């Protein structure tokens, strides 16, 4: 079992699980274990594939839909809407330091939030039953009542699709392209940049 002496969410010392502040920010005040009663292995592959196939979040890293049930993080059952996204250690074995990727993403988000006061998605680090870490983030595209908040990404604003821009259309833009789109579509674009 994975033990800790810091909050796996806020990284504050003196906690052996999530701190009250983390529980409020990430888990709506519910007491939640930082250890999942589940590990990714050959026996659980089907459950993972089913979850991955029903989530539509952009990006290249594997993402698994999750909910909180009885104080535990669990994979979203069929027919339910996930409120969290789990990002485990990538399966691609040639990635150097791949076991550090969940912690790196979490630390980066905490620096953005705590040091630079950037409004980020609520997030934490958690662990599978075998001790492997995963990054967990609360979905910001759903309201508390469960209704969906419509989101636009820059690929759709730019009119890019797989058909007109190729398979990797979401990743072919640049920051300059985004700045130009802001200038075209936002009256106070200087403030947004």
Where are the model-predicted features located?
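Conserved kinase catalytic-core segment
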Residues: 99-116, 173-193
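Active-site-proximal helix-loop elements at catalytic-domain edges
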Residues: 159-181
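Regulatory N- and C-terminal appendages and interdomain linkers associated
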Residues: 1-44, 184
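Generic secondary-structure transition motif, activating predominantly at the C-termini of alpha-helices
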Residues: 26-31, 141, 158, 162, ...
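Exposed alpha-helical structural elements
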Residues: 22, 31-34, 153, 173-177
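Conserved ATP-binding subdomain of kinase catalytic cores across diverse folds
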Residues: 43-166
């Amino acid at each position: 079992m994975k033990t800790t002496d810091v909050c796996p969410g806020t990284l504050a010392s003196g906690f052996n699980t999530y701190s009250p502040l983390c529980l409020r920010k990430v888990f709506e005040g519910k007491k939640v274990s930082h250890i999942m009663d589940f590990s990714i292995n050959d026996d659980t592959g089907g459950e993972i594939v089913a979850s991955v196939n029903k989530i539509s979040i952009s990006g290249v890293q594997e993402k698994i839909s999750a909910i909180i049930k009885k104080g535990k993080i669990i994979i979203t059952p069929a027919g339910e809407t996930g409120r969290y996204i789990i990002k485990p250690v990538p399966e691609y074995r040639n990635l150097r330091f791949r076991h550090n990727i969940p912690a790196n993403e979490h630390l980066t988000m905490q620096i953005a939030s705590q040091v630079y006061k950037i409004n980020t998605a609520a997030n934490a680090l958690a662990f599978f039953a075998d001790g492997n870490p995963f990054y967990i983030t609360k979905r910001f595209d759903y309201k508390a009542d469960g209704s969906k908040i419509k989101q636009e990404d820059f690929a759709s604003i730019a009119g890019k699709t797989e058909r007109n821009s190729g398979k990797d259309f979401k990743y072919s833009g640049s920051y300059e392209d985004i700045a130009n789109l802001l200038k075209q579509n936002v009256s106070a674009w200087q403030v947004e940049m």
